[in-house]
Amino acid sequence: EFLWGLRLNNERGWFLAHKEEFLTYVDGPTRELARELTAEMTRLYPQLGLVSKVSRIYRDARRLYGRGPYKDHLWFSLRRPAEHEGATPCFFFEVAPERYSYGMGCWDPTPLTMAKLRARMDRDPAEAEKLVRQVARRGEFQLEGESYKRPKGDPGPLLYPWYNSRQFSLCRDENCEGPYFTAELRDRVLEGWKPLAPASRWVEAAAADPSPDHM
C-alpha cells in the first residue's frame, strides 16, 4: 500500500509523513530478503563471488525529467563486483506497487561481450542450446531485452533471440497477492534463481574469451 500511495503522491511532504511505513514495510523487509538470499546463494555458489546491492528510493536529482523525487519501486541485485556493474550478469529482485519480479540479467553489456557470446554460440551451439533448454523447460522466465535492429545472424530458432540481443534478462513477474516478504517468497526466489546460475556463469566466462574476428 505504501508504494501505491507514493505513486499517487510523489512529493516530499507525503513521503516524510509516511517514512516510517516505508522503513518498516518496504525498505527493511527488502534488505532482510537481500541478506538472506545473498547468504544462501553464496553458500550454494561461492565461486560466483556475489555481493548484494539494494537500490535507494530517492531518484537522482539530475534525472527527474518532470517526475517526482522518489521511485515507486525498490530492487536489489546480486553480482560479482565490477568496474561497470551493468556489464556483468546479476540476479535481481524488484518490488513495485502492482507486482514483484525476479530473475537474472545483464542490462548494459559491452558490444565486445555480446560478440564473444555470439562466438561461443558459433563454436559450441550444443552447449548454448542446453543452457537455453534448461531455462525454457521450467517455463518460469521470459527472455526480455533490446534486440539489434539488424540481426547479427541466424543460429536457429532456439538461439536466435539470444544471438541477436543487445542486452537481456530472464524475468518472472508475480502479482502482489501471494506470499510477500515471507520465508515462502525467499524460497520461491531462491528456487527460481538456481537454474539460472549456469547461464550466469556462461555469460560471465565469455568475458575471458579472446576477441572474435567479427563484432
Question: PLM ranges: what are they?
Answer:
Residues F15, P97, D173:
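Residues forming anionic-ligand binding surfaces in small-molecule and nucleic-acid pockets
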Residues W4-I57:
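Active-site acidic/histidine clusters and adjacent loop/turn architecture
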Residues F22, V26, T30, M114-L117, ...:
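Amphipathic alpha-helical coiled-coil segments
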